[in-house]
């Protein structure tokens, strides 16, 4: 199983002082050096952490793959077509939220999604949709032209009992199998950490996990390389 590291909150820390450090690009290069298979950044409409210049520099400097999380807007599509990340992950976005709070409302926005995906795929940019692990959402993502789905694991991460945890894991497992049978690459992310990631090692239809806040917050105490290694030790098959 691969690990993609989200470096948004390196930028959050930098922006607290509006100075140049810590540099998210430097963090991305360090993450790659220590085992990250990809770098994730979310260019929000309000630019609350990652800035346009960060994205441009990431595209120039990283050597694994660049996953640009973004809202489904004309502005973001234009940026993606210009910067040419390896893939984009389409996420719901609300200005008042602290972090992405759930999966993309794919049923509601299906027609627009289909139109939005095509120019990106025509430029050989992979398209992932951040969805709940549900069969209908998977089918619609594939029908819209996405080649990747990322399952929102926030519900799983908030489970407070063994029964709840087992139910959510089985829901994710079954959804991953369905997605793989449709030819989609399957990623999982949101709320994953050293406290709850271990069972994902056995979910063989999930190829990659995307983790940001848990790694960056842990890195404050033990350093970024060690924080990444903790996760890798738990997910390597």
Swiss-Prot record:
Main location: cytoplasm
EC number: 2.6.99.2
Subcellular localization(s) per the UniProt record: Cytoplasm
The entry's keywords: Cytoplasm, Pyridoxine biosynthesis, Transferase
Pfam family, any one: PdxJ
Residues annotated as catalytic: 42, 69, 190
Site (Transition state stabilizer): 150
Record-level GO cellular component terms: cytosol
SUPFAM superfamilies: Pyridoxine 5'-phosphate synthase
BP terms from Gene Ontology: pyridoxine biosynthetic process
Binding site for 3-amino-2-oxopropyl phosphate: 6, 17, 191, 212-213
Domain of life, per lineage: Bacteria
Pathway: Cofactor biosynthesis; pyridoxine 5'-phosphate biosynthesis; pyridoxine 5'-phosphate from D-erythrose 4-phosphate: step 5/5
Single Gene Ontology MF annotation: pyridoxine 5'-phosphate synthase activity
Catalytic reaction list: 3-amino-2-oxopropyl phosphate + 1-deoxy-D-xylulose 5-phosphate = pyridoxine 5'-phosphate + phosphate + 2 H2O + H(+)
Family statement: Belongs to the PNP synthase family.
Subunit structure: Homooctamer; tetramer of dimers.
PANTHER family for the chain: PYRIDOXINE 5'-PHOSPHATE SYNTHASE (PTHR30456:SF0)
Biological function: Catalyzes the complicated ring closure reaction between the two acyclic compounds 1-deoxy-D-xylulose-5-phosphate (DXP) and 3-amino-2-oxopropyl phosphate (1-amino-acetone-3-phosphate or AAP) to form pyridoxine 5'-phosphate (PNP) and inorganic phosphate.
Protein name in the entry: Pyridoxine 5'-phosphate synthase
């Amino acid at each position: 199983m691969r690990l993609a590291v989200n470096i948004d909150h390196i930028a959050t820390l930098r922006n607290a002082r509006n100075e140049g450090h810590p540099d998210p690009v430097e963090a991305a290069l360090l993450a790659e050096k220590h085992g990250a298979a990809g770098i994730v950044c979310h260019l929000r409409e309000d630019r609350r952490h990652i800035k346009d210049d960060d994205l441009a520099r990431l595209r120039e400097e990283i050597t694994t793959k660049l996953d640009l999380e973004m809202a489904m807007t004309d502005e973001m599509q234009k940026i993606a077509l210009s910067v040419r990340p390896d893939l984009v992950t389409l996420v719901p976005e609300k200005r008042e939220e602290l972090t992405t709070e759930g999966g993309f409302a794919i049923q509601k926005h299906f027609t627009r999604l289909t139109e939005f995906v095509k120019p990106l795929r025509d430029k050989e940019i992979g398209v992932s949709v951040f969805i709940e692990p549900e069969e209908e959402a998977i089918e619609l993502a594939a029908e819209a032209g996405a080649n990747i789905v990322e399952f929102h694991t926030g519900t799983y991460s908030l489970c407070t009992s063994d029964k709840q945890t087992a139910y959510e894991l089985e829901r994710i497992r079954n959804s991953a199998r369905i997605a793989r049978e449709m030819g989609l690459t399957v990623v999982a992310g949101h709320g994953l950490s050293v406290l709850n990631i271990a069972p994902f090692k056995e979910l063989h239809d999930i190829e990659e996990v995307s983790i940001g806040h848990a790694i960056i917050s842990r890195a404050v105490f033990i350093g970024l390389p060690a924080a990444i290694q903790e996760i890798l030790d738990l997910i390597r098959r």
